[in-house]
Amino acid sequence: MAPERLRSRTVSAFKLRGLLLRSEATKYLTEALQSVTELELEENLGKIIDAVEKQPLSSNMIERSVVEAAVQECSQSMDETIEHVFNIIGAFDIPRFIYNSERKKFLPLSMTNHAAPTLFGTARDKAELYLERYTILHQRTHRHELFTPPVIGSHLEESGSKFQLKTIETLLGSTSKVGDVIVLGMITQLKEGKFFLEDPTGTVQLDLSKAQFHSGLYTEACFVLAEGWFEDQVFHANAFGFPPTEPSSTTRAYYGNINFFGGPSNASVKTYTKLRQLEDENKDAMFVIVSDVWLDQVQVLEKFHVMFSGYSPAPPTCFILCGNFSSAPYGKNQVQALKDSLKSLADIICEYPSIHQSSRFVFVPGPEDPGFGSILPRPPLAESITQEFRQRVPFSVFTTNPCRIQYCTQEIIIFREDLVNKMCRNCVRFPSSSLDIPTHFVKTILSQGHLAPLPLYVCPVHWAYDYTLRVYPVPDLLVIADKYDPFTVTNTDCLCINPGSFPRSGFAFKVFYPSSKTVEDSKLQGF
């Protein structure tokens, strides 16, 4: 590419992100990118700008030293691409990003005045828990085509189809009736039997007598778009809907190649063409997902014999085994019983050398496994329990609940919690059609951008680690392992699955094929 054209495109790319290059920085970049083809230029410039934005910038004027550091970081990440094929990311290793309303971008924790998270959170952590959930949904909703301000000079019909969000403070400051308003807020029950709508500016009592609820499971502590009118200090709701979802590609178009997901990669793995190529070429890759692996049940261990014998000619990439790992939780002998059960599973795995040597085993603890209560995120099973198993099965990882798995360019979230029943029990208004609960459930999770949109007394969360339960940007695969009936639902380019309870569902499990992004329902019957 001609140097002048390359220089022009480089300067334009930085200007689009609100950055200006010093002449020395422009010259350095033009020389560094001289050998890059026109097809690769846009991708490489995007990565360099992302690396620049990660640095603490004093102004939008970019010096040569900043650009040099960014290019060096990108060069290292290119060399490390092959190491990024498969990564398991525990909840406590997930990076935290905080949305800055003034700059309209997500900043890493290190570039903010927030303290590092701790298990023993402060009162500020609890307040910020809800504030951050609100802020993420607010910025996402504001960008939706229905809520973006109409373009000056656009047709009246187009302007008429736009909506404007109001704050509760605006309503409370009005002395007369305010009709036809839409408010984004959280449903709360500040007084017994009376529901309120809350946002960062205030609270207002709700009148639900005439409210129509769109599809979804509307629980306390979930965020809604409430449409109605305000009169006499009461918001009379006509309709409730959830904040609109957006595909991962749309989120990344706004925020660039930030690695929200976690893992060793500096930028989002979606940007790596080598990983995409590996993913497409490896058509035999598969993930076997099983939940409620009751290792103390002889029948369950027998079924694993059958499963491993079937898969041994073509071992899966990974077995994802979710708890509970005992059928009878608690008790003074639970820890020793679990150690013995894991020893039995290791014996079975060692009988199949092809699986033992090439498949990975990921263990996600369940709500009734030994641990520190039922607060999320849950740490892995204790090392004292798993030490012998890990020595015998080297490719095994005992991780947190929830956890994340990155395979090539695909992002997978695993969460083991009996969530469907909890959400149904805590609904403000149960859906009129209970036939399609999985669809309602999946829509709720993705719209809320959170794995557990429930009150903290129903589903406790470590306040400072609430960000680890985010489902934003939307992953490629969301596994919510629940004792509810197995299901597979696609929403917003995200595949959401529940493998069901292995012993309770007739030994059903799911198999995910990353290259085609398909899920296969499987069952061990008649063996």
From Swiss-Prot:
Annotated Gene Ontology cellular component terms: epsilon DNA polymerase complex; nuclear body
Keywords from the UniProt entry: DNA replication, DNA-binding, Nucleus
Localization per record: Nucleus
Pfam families named in the record: DNA_pol_E_B, Dpoe2NT
InterPro entries: DNA_pol_a/d/e_bsu, DNA_pol_e_bsu_N, POLE2
The family this protein is said to belong to: Belongs to the DNA polymerase epsilon subunit B family.
Function description: Accessory component of the DNA polymerase epsilon complex. Participates in DNA repair and in chromosomal DNA replication.
Miscellaneous remark of the record: In eukaryotes there are five DNA polymerases: alpha, beta, gamma, delta, and epsilon which are responsible for different reactions of DNA synthesis.
The protein's name in its UniProt record: DNA polymerase epsilon subunit 2
